[in-house]
Amino acid sequence: DFFRAYKDFSDRHIDAIEIMVSRLYEKWGISDTTDFGHLKPEDYPILSDLYDLIEEEYQGYDADAHQLYTAELLQEILLGLHSMCKGAEAKFFNGHTNVTSSRFIVFGVKGLLQANRSVRGAMLFNILSFMSDRLLTIGNTTAVLDELYVWLSDNITVGTTIIEYIRNILKRVRKKESNLIMASQ
């Protein structure tokens, strides 16, 4: 959903990206059995690592290997992700987390009103995913979505996805003794 919030990727694009993300984590030694509590931010790959892996796959593409994706599909993914991973928008997305304490976190989203749709949608989705994880995995957490209209983006696809995430959070937070508060003008 994060990549779809950024660009209008088809299901085929997302499926290929998921394969590449799995390979990237495997390359970094991260699996379902990894003890994430011992990992530092630098122990995780960043988006440029994903881009490099996809580019490597594209450059060495072997049509006879019966891949689940085509070279053309990889090229389209590279074009769609370039700005986020290597270009002008990489400053927003391509880096390790700078959250050093999780006791009280404020994400100021007012400045996102001036950002282009793809950046705004992806950044809001990133924040919502982080909040969802804290609310539903850690539990005993309160999150506030202020300026709700910003979250309900003018991009129909992103807005619908965000609404679904909010709805799913609201259905499950009580079981984790968490709260989601929404406000707007």
Regions from the PLM with identified roles:
Residues 1-178:
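P-loop NTPase motor domains
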Residues 184:
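H-loop/switch region of ABC-family ATPase nucleotide-binding domains
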